[in-house]
């Protein structure tokens, strides 16, 4: 059994035995405390840090999607309802085990340095300028999340891309009740 803090998706459908979506793993806070109840499933299970993202993942599976489809849809949903935990402006990687072929695949979509970045760009007079390296616009990377999710979908997904992102578009357009933590984050 997989035990990790944060969001994870475990699917036992025929195409995929296990998906570890490390970009979603985050520390659990008081708003996502575990109830202590045991839950079992014979076909598939979706668990995330936010119930709306969990609903999105379950709906994708119920509509014939596989674990990758659900992971992609969940990632976009989390970037709407819990943007500080799973932003599309970030990056990550995905490890996939394909049960039919018994092969493992890794998709690395971590942020990359901008094209004009140089090795010494944060060094001033021979010393690392921490403020420049950590708190300036120069310290940002080129996001990889959307590209990585797209590659995973192209290689392993079943459902149309639009069907995977539509729930997140609806959440963003129609709105949702935010948690106290998100409210605090947005107000800072």
Where are these regions (language model features)?
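Bacterial N-terminal signal peptides that target proteins for export
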Residues: 2-17
């Amino acid at each position: 059994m997989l035990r990790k803090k944060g969001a994870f998706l475990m699917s036992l459908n025929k195409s995929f035995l296990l998906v570890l979506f490390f970009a979603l793993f985050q520390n659990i806070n008081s708003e996502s405390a575990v109830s202590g109840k045991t839950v079992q499933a014979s076909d598939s299970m979706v668990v995330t840090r936010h119930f709306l993202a969990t609903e999105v993942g379950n709906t994708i599976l119920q509509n014939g999607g596989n674990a990758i489809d659900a992971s992609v849809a969940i990632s976009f949903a989390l970037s709407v309802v819990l943007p500080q935990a799973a932003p599309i402006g970030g990056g990550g990687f995905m490890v996939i085990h394909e049960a039919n072929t018994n092969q493992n695949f890794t998709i690395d979509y971590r942020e990359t340095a901008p094209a004009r970045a140089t090795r010494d760009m944060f060094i001033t007079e021979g010393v690392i300028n921490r403020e420049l390296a950590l708190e300036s616009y120069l310290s940002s990377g080129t996001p990889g999340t959307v590209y990585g999710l797209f590659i995973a979908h192209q290689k392993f997904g079943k459902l149309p891309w639009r069907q995977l992102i539509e729930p997140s578009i609806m959440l963003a357009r129609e709105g949702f009740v935010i948690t106290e933590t998100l409210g605090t984050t947005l107000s800072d």
